[in-house]
Amino acid sequence: MFNLKNRNFLTLMDFTPKEINYFLDLARDLKRAKYTGTEVQRMKGKNIALIFEKASTRTRCAFEVGAKDQGAHVTYLGPTGSHIGKKESAADTARVLGRMYDGIEYRGFGQEIVETLAEYAGVPVWNGLTDEDHPTQILADFLTIREHFNKPLNEIKFAYVGDGANNMANALMIGAVKMGMDFRIVSPKEIPTDATLVAKCKEIAAETGAKVTITDNIEEGVKGCDVLYTDVWVSMGEPDSVWESKIKLLTPYRVDMNMIKMTGNPDAKFMHCLPAFHDEETAVGKEIKEKYGLSEMEVSHELFESKYSIVFDEAENRMHTIKAVMVATLGDQ
């Protein structure tokens, strides 16, 4: 057992491998309890504030359902539902909400915002996504890998393919080195991963037995991998010029059936944090088709819908792992 009561959950950098495994074990146990109808509520009477400066499907639903399952009440503060950063500073917001709520989730922009909330709130603060990191997603990813592979995380070979500069590349690398994994970022040289973070992760890897490889060579990067992972290439609201340059650079890095074959591993799996641009069935998908002539972006539709894809198991596990974070840091033990 680990006492994580009142701890903030801002980045996996703040946790030991044993503590991360504790979150994963707790999530597994909570998932089993939910499935069997034996869940014990450990957050009765708790009040939780959910601050979303960016829209969300999985993260919001995971926090709301997880809290409800555990007997807590939530207040959702959407992109237009609070004054944070506009009329009121993050520090002031934290001191107000910390007097009314038992825990605060933040999904938004800079990592410094969630860190400021944590500094001033006086209650546990959880990072639901920032521009630099996405730690709750990594717990869901690792729980899903545990469920699909009969070997420990430190024997997993894992490649993140695509935009090496985005928050998922950062977050996965942090989690992977903590857990001793063979981790590769396969990305064009023109989109480099943060050098300071890479250096820090290599220091951790030296202690945990992990391996970190940054390469633009797809064949070399995915060889022998158990998991191929990708994320969207561009974010909504970025200018057309960014879309054009990113698409040109990243189209060769689309994860497809051929790339799965390149792993040489018949048991390889495909993962994605979602949403994914794999067809023309969305407004964005249609716009991409009209502007750039592409029916699929970071992943082929064929692979997304194939037996190799475990993206919906991964999405479900967002709820179980987020619930574990809340129970571990706020629940009655």
Swiss-Prot record:
It catalyses: carbamoyl phosphate + L-ornithine = L-citrulline + phosphate + H(+). One of its GO terms (molecular function) is amino acid binding. GO terms for biological process: arginine biosynthetic process via ornithine; arginine catabolic process to ornithine; citrulline biosynthetic process. Pathway: Amino-acid degradation; L-arginine degradation via ADI pathway; carbamoyl phosphate from L-arginine: step 2/2. Coiled coil: none annotated. InterPro entries: Asp/Orn_carbamoyltranf_P-bd, Asp/Orn_carbamoylTrfase, Asp/Orn_carbamoylTrfase_sf, Asp_carbamoyltransf_Asp/Orn-bd, Orn/put_carbamltrans, OTCase_ArgI. Pfam families: OTCace, OTCace_N. Reversibly catalyzes the transfer of the carbamoyl group from carbamoyl phosphate (CP) to the N(epsilon) atom of ornithine (ORN) to produce L-citrulline. Belongs to the aspartate/ornithine carbamoyltransferase superfamily. OTCase family. L-ornithine binds at N167, D231, S235, M236. The gene is arcB. The keyword DNA repair does not apply. GO terms for cellular component: cytoplasm. Keywords: Arginine metabolism, Cytoplasm, Transferase. Carbamoyl phosphate binds at S56, T57, R58, T59, R107, H134, P135, T136, Q137, C273, L274, R318. It comes from Clostridium botulinum (strain Okra / Type B1). It is found in: Cytoplasm. This is Ornithine carbamoyltransferase. Its EC number is 2.1.3.3.
